[in-house]
């Protein structure tokens, strides 16, 4: 079950991200007949970023419970560099498709703000910000 999956924190994040992308992006796109691989990759990067930020928030607790995650296995500066790299990758995919518009830039800025300030806010604000980031991405995808 989930208890045994906690020992494999890296795998857990991958599986959670994959299921989230499958349920909230791939299946709806497929059902509507508008499957766009680049958009799917962009969404995957944002979901991965969100999962990694959740890991970072719980890194000390996970380390005490011997749960290995990306956030507690590498230095904080390396972790932040990887998170910023995900946002740059998101922008690069949009640029490659000539779709680097205001919405994409605002999404990336929102992600950068979450990366920058996740450790400084309360647990409640953190939950709202990260889940809000995913909701913001999904809603702007629907209406753009």
Could you describe each region identified by the protein language model?
Residues 1, 22, 42-59, 108-119:
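Transmembrane alpha-helical segments that form the membrane-embedded catalytic/substrate-channel core
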Residues 1, 81-129:
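Transmembrane helix-loop-helix
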Residues 1-20, 67-79, 115-143:
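Interhelical loop and helix-boundary elements at the membrane-water interface
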Residues 24-41, 92-101, 141-144:
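Helix-coil boundary and interhelical linker segments in multi-pass alpha-helical membrane proteins
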Residues 43, 47, 87-91, 134-141:
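Helical transmembrane-bundle signal
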């Amino acid at each position: 079950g989930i208890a045994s999956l906690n020992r494999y924190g890296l795998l857990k994040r991958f599986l959670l991200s994959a299921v989230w992308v499958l349920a909230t992006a791939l299946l709806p796109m497929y059902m509507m007949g508008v499957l766009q691989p680049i958009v799917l990759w962009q969404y995957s990067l944002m979901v991965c970023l969100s999962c990694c930020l959740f890991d970072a928030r719980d890194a000390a607790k996970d380390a005490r419970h011997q749960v290995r995650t990306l956030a507690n296995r590498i230095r904080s500066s390396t972790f932040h560099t990887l998170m910023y790299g995900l946002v740059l990758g998101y922008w690069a995919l949009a640029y490659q498709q000539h779709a680097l518009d205001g919405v994409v830039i605002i999404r990336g800025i929102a992600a950068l703000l979450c990366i920058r300030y996740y450790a400084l806010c309360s647990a409640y604000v953190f939950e709202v910000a990260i889940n809000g980031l995913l909701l913001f991405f999904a809603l702007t995808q629907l209406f753009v």
